[in-house]
Amino acid sequence: MIVGPGVAGSKDDDSNYTPSGTMGRLHWLLKGGRSKSSNDSMSYIDVQDCAAHHIAAMENPNASGRYFSLVESWHWNDILSTLKELYPPLQLDANFKYEGEDIIRPTQFNHDRMNSLGVNVKGIKEIFEECISFFQDKGAL
């Protein structure tokens, strides 16, 4: 999921900000849209880091083929726990974590090609912190 502060809007129209797309999905989570974890994982990347990957690949004459642009994948237990830590008003069920015997391992990716582009990326927790701050600045949280 590509998330991060949007470029649309201005300081003059913060009251009209309505999160959409993947930021809308993250906003929905922070507003309590999911109160329990599913046995699945999600991959994240900051929008600015993703854009930097695109530019670096375009500018690199040796770049060809497919490049993944993502930080890593986290299980929903970790995603919701981190969002709750960063945004305490988040409402989750008391036993929100998935605790089945069949708990999955988050999807793993080889980052060698992505890292060859030389772009330093933010971690998921930092991405979430910036998104929450952005929503708060816009009055959406």
Residue ranges and their predicted role:
Residues 18-25, 36-56:
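Substrate-positioning beta->alpha
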Residues 46-50, 75, 123:
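An acidic site on a long C-lobe helix of protein kinase domains
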